[in-house]
A protein has these predicted regions:
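Cytoplasmic/organellar membrane-interface segments at the starts of transmembrane helices
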Residues: 271, 401-403, 458-524
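N-terminal signal-anchor/start-transfer transmembrane helix
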Residues: 9-27, 249-252, 256
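Hydrophobic transmembrane alpha-helices and their helix-loop junctions in integral membrane proteins
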Residues: 111-117, 135-147, 161-463
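Transmembrane helix-loop-helix hairpins at membrane boundaries of multipass inner-membrane proteins
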Residues: 1-5, 23-114, 118-128, 209-211, ...
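Short phosphate-coordinating micro-motif centered on Lys-Gly-acidic
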Residues: 154
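Short hydrophobic alpha-helical membrane-embedded segments
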Residues: 9-12, 102-103, 124-133, 340
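Hydrophobic alpha-helical membrane-insertion segments
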Residues: 37-57, 183-199, 408-415, 452, ...
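Alpha-helical transmembrane segments and their helix-start/interface "positive-inside/aromatic belt" motifs
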Residues: 29-41, 174-186, 401-406, 482-490
């Protein structure tokens, strides 16, 4: 097994949380610095993973080609007559689909910790919950056992509920409850399908006996299907189709995909800035990651049937999100709806079932994480100074806050997809993949309207806030401080680096994506 680096990067925040709980509440500075050190250590560990990553290993369904594997028997219960042996493994590993998400989670968690420096209310509680949330997010991207995946998935629910419900805005309770109900509903769908797949998948033990398993890789291989399993690929039925829809819906709520999106604007508007950064930067990606990791390889025949519908919902997300963003007068709500729109590009790329399109989709997941995190930080900077997010309340800030204006311009142009910035590459790959498939070409053509609408609402927002005469009310607003530089400079650097040298990320993904496409389109 070697050094358990995946366990370390996943559970290090839990260790930090335990230490924080034993610290006196008066030591708020110590709590903040400890949290920052923990999340910075995660960034270092993620970089170590990337530096030692083997680009030629595929992963996806082959355990031997996953990297940094940690696997041992975690739960083993025998003697239950109707269940037989219950076997659950502690099984972690990464491939080209999960590695970019591990890196993204580490980076965004560190940036969000910096953004949390202004938190003064119940500092111990905030950072303890934040670090617990961090472990849940990281665990989702490294777990290869469905039961373990589900534990990490659920682990995020309560911390996020309390982080919004306690430290949020005026309507924080409503937003937190709405988030909780939507996410819990999705979790119920995922749980039901997980149980069905468990009783439809067997694994051969050392003594030759077969037992049911939660192993995700075993679920992808038809050779492990139980002939009489309700969701067995050897026993095709409408139940497999229903299970696919239920599982997809469970993940779609987190994306969020229209019409499951209504919790997101409320959660973003009421959440404190660091939690909006985490929500947009990482949590939304978990939905599309779950579809790629579980739906696609376990139900390949249904994925092929529904690719047109996935593309259609991607198009709806793109255009609907952009149109609603165009109508917003609240800066934060505008960015929230722009997230709905940009996650539509991920769905469109995934729907193409091509290596180009899915590479673009995963790259878009990473790029959206960094760009949208930067956008929410930008909203937080101006709100901390002016205590308003009304787009029509400002004007002429470019002369008063020139450095801030520069960072806003970078983030806005990256969101639009300007060449030399990371968003351009991922969106180009998405459309190349979608245009290459006859059945979804019309959908891809209509979806390009989202690019035009995105440019409209971003440039109009830029004009309203930063150009024209300066509102005298804001004549004394200070420009960025050192902490804000530390938050924004790394994200801007990543945006330009991946825009100029996208191969740094695409090379990590490509082998795994090719293998996934082969599995979904041709089978094992």
């Amino acid at each position: 097994m070697g050094f358990p680096i995946l366990s370390l990067i996943t559970f290090l925040p839990i260790l930090g949380m335990i230490i924080i709980l034993f610290l006196p509440k008066e030591q708020s500075k110590t709590v903040k610095w400890l949290s920052l050190a923990i999340t910075f250590a995660q960034v270092i560990l993620a970089c170590v993973l990337l530096a030692n990553y083997n680009y030629n290993a595929a992963g996806v369904f082959d355990e031997k080609s996953f990297q940094f594997i940690e696997k041992f028997r975690w739960i083993n219960i025998t003697g239950i007559s109707w269940l037989g042996t219950v076997k659950i493994d502690y099984f972690l590993g990464i491939d080209g689909i999960s590695t970019p998400m591990v890196l993204l989670t580490a980076i965004i968690s560190f940036i969000a910790t910096l953004s949390s420096w202004s938190i003064e209310k119940s500092v111990k509680g905030f950072f303890a919950l934040f670090l617990l949330l961090d472990t849940g997010m990281m665990g989702v991207f490294v777990a290869l056992d469905f039961f373990l995946f589900y534990i990490f998935w659920e682990l995020m629910l309560l911390p996020m509920y309390f982080l919004i419900g306690i430290w949020g805005g005026p309507r924080k309770e409503y937003a937190a409850i709405k988030f909780f109900i939507y996410t819990l509903l999705g979790s119920v769908f995922i749980l039901l399908v997980m149980i069905g797949l468990y009783f439809s998948t067997t694994e051969t033990m050392a003594d030759g006996t077969k037992v049911f398993t939660f192993n995700l890789l075993a679920m992808m291989n038809p050779a492990n299907s139980a002939p009489d399993g309700i969701l067995s690929i050897l026993n095709p039925s409408n139940l497999r189709f229903i299970a696919y829809i239920a599982l997809f819906a469970g993940f779609a709520i987190k994306i969020p995909m229209f019409p499951f999106h209504t919790w997101l604007p409320d959660a973003h508007v009421e959440a404190p800035t660091p939690i909006s950064v985490i929500l947009a930067g990482v949590l939304l990606k978990m939905g599309t990651y779950g579809i790629l990791r579980i739906n696609y390889p376990i139900f390949p025949e249904i994925t092929r049937q529904l690719m047109w519908w996935i593309a259609l919902f991607g198009m709806i997300n793109i255009i609907y999100g952009a149109l609603v963003a165009l109508a917003q007068k609240d800066f934060k709500k505008l960015i929230a709806y722009s997230s709905v729109s940009h996650m539509g590009y991920v769905l469109l790329g995934m729907a193409s079932l091509t290596a180009t399109g899915i590479n673009g989709a995963i790259f878009q997941m990473f790029n959206h994480g960094t760009i949208t995190a930067m956008l929410f930080l930008i909203v937080g900077v101006i709100y901390d100074r002016a205590h308003t997010r009304g787009l029509n309340d400002f004007g002429g800030l470019a002369t008063q806050m020139p450095v801030y204006t520069g960072f806003v311009t970078v983030a806005f142009f990256a969101a639009i997809g300007l060449p030399s910035m990371s968003g351009f590459i991922s969106e180009t790959f998405v459309f190349l993949g979608a245009f290459s498939i006859n059945s979804i070409r019309i959908i891809a053509i209509v979806s390009t309207l989202g690019i035009l609408l995105g440019a409209c609402y971003m440039l109009w927002t830029l004009q309203r806030i930063f150009f024209g005469p300066l509102n005298e009310k804001w004549a004394t607003l200070p420009d960025l401080d050192k902490r804000e530089y530390a938050m924004l400079v790394p994200l801007a650097a990543i945006i330009f680096f991946l825009g100029i040298y996208p191969s740094a990320m695409i090379n990590v993904m490509n082998k795994s994506v090719n293998t996934l496409v082969m599995l979904v389109t041709k089978g094992l």
